[in-house]
């Protein structure tokens, strides 16, 4: 499994933590996680949290 597939799997696994069940994730969401890791020096878990929190805030 490549890193991008792993990131997508992690994103999908944590959707329910943010009441985002049913939200369709895209490659742009994976890009956002990668940007968070590189730009803000976040761990994978923290980057996923930041992206999902951002999606949640936009939808609420």
Q: Which ranges hold each PLM region?
A:
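N-terminal acidic leader/helix
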Residues: 1-22
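Short, charge-rich amphipathic interface segments used for partner binding and complex assembly
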Residues: 24-60
């Amino acid at each position: 499994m490549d890193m991008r597939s792993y990131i997508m799997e992690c994103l999908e696994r944590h959707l329910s933590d943010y009441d985002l069940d049913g939200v369709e994730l895209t490659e742009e969401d994976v890009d956002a996680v990668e940007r968070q890791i590189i730009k803000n020096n976040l761990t994978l878990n923290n980057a996923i949290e930041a992206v999902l929190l951002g999606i949640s805030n936009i939808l609420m």
